[in-house]
């Protein structure tokens, strides 16, 4: 059953959803999938919060161990994820994630979602994530960072223009994720570079210092 939040937006991914995964694989192969799954381990018994997970196909291989919540603002993507992850123990939610008291998670996955948001939206989301994370919980970030060569800069420019046109993305550039996270007292615990560092997979936790 899908759970609806009170704050919904027009589904900007309705045109992309049917072929989004195939398009991603055509352009990047399995590199983006690997960035989302390279830190996924010992999931059994953990409660996971997935925000902006798309069609969920990249998580299918370990869906039997997934328990928690799956949030999407695209109804078409969420419907596909519910089918692709029908073997999981996730509940599926349509709308913008908002923390609920005493509903906390071991892990929060932010995979290729922050690059679609304005800085102030990222900051607001991270506040909600902070409320929803257990004291020793981790945030798993995977996203595009600074392009490492001319070809990557060209490809990124094409991608940004494409998603601004087709999916109404707001940004004309990439956020400085690390600056925003550090400003909110998050610590980077681990990092893996993909595509020479254009894509990074990172693990973050809350600093215990003030």
Where are these regions (language model features)?
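Class I SAM-dependent methyltransferase SAM/SAH-binding core
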Residues: 49-99
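C-terminal alpha-helical "lid/dimerization" subdomain adjacent to the S-adenosyl-L-methionine
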Residues: 142-184, 188-194, 198
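N-terminal, positively charged/glycine-rich alpha-helical extensions of SAM-dependent methyltransferases
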Residues: 1-19
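A conserved beta-strand element that flanks and buttresses the S-adenosyl-L-methionine
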Residues: 109
